[in-house]
Amino acid sequence: MRRLIRLCLRMFWTGVIALLATYATVIGWTYLWPLDRPLPRGDAIICLGASIDDRGQLGPGSVMRAERCGDLWRAGVAPVVVFSGGVPRPGAPSAAAAMADRSGVPEATARIEGQSHSTLQNALFSLRITGTDARLVLVTEAFHLPRSWASFRAMGAHDLALVPAGRLRPDGRAMLLRETAAIWFNAGRYILWRMTAAFLPDDIRTDLLH
């Protein structure tokens, strides 16, 4: 019994240390990420969705990302923009469509991916539009960039440039804690998604990434 208790305590403290280390890392890259790098060039800009309410009103993170992607498109960073983000409820407008409208990017150069509900699904569905060999410019807030990069790499993207829409949305410090948990949660979901490839249909496996 004592051995089991020691094992449980060891696992508990290992988990605590891992979470604290992850949190410190998230804070570090959020506030140290350079915002003034030269703009990259690519085949497509990927605008990753954030929050949207049932009425179709974009949250501050989505607004930041949409406006940044519009600016990048007008600067000639890429010829098309893929807006990626699903619907808050059936029948509601997608985050992707609302962000495309907010960005000012013309319909002819905007691509709407309106199915995704997670960063992993952003990657999976966006790459079905662009292909895995396209040169992609990922746009999101600085705190979210590393997980976005890892998600797109995991889904097969080869050439990725990262551009922050800003460090953090206004009053968004709670997002740092959420991102800490999301990193580990995403890793677990991705492992489960890969492990079930041999015996689950694709639609069910896709739901695992929700």
Model-predicted segments: where are they?
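N-terminal membrane-anchoring alpha-helices
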Residues: 1-43, 199-205
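A structural signal for short, hydrophobic/glycine-enriched beta-strand patches
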Residues: 26-177
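A transmembrane-helix-recognition feature enriched in membrane-embedded lipid enzymes
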Residues: 172-199
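Active-site cores that bind ATP or allylic diphosphates and position pyrophosphate for catalysis
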Residues: 208-210
